[in-house]
Amino acid sequence: MAAHMSRFVRVILPTLMLLALPAGCIKHSVIPDEPDVVTISVSNSNPLDMTVYAVNQSMRIRLGTVSTASTQRFTLSLHQISPTGELQLLADPVGSRRTFTSEPIHVFAGQAVEWVLQVDLRQSTLTIRS
């Protein structure tokens, strides 16, 4: 019995471990290889600096701050916002109590959103490019 157990430990166990090794190297992710991100570019023509958020229903994701007369680019993963890709952008002027929210948009992986904030925020423009 000891010889049989010794052969198991010496030959069969290492063979089983070698056979199981490739299974540990298989990628088990359900996320596709290509990134599920959108690029959001915000140009600020308003005299106030803006803190920009992506909004989905009641959830806000802070993207960053855009200074006056500058443009910032942000990357947002789609699974951070919603499975449908629906979101709104919110501009919160620094030092003001008023905020401005874009109309709802639907974005898909790889798309680029360009938001140009004007002096009168109601005249701001939003463009989606593939």
Language model segments and positions:
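A short, solvent-exposed beta-strand micro-motif common in secreted/extracellular proteins
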Residues: 82-95
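Bacterial Sec signal peptide processing site at the extreme N-terminus
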Residues: 19-39
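Short amphipathic beta-strand segments in non-cytosolic proteins
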Residues: 53-60
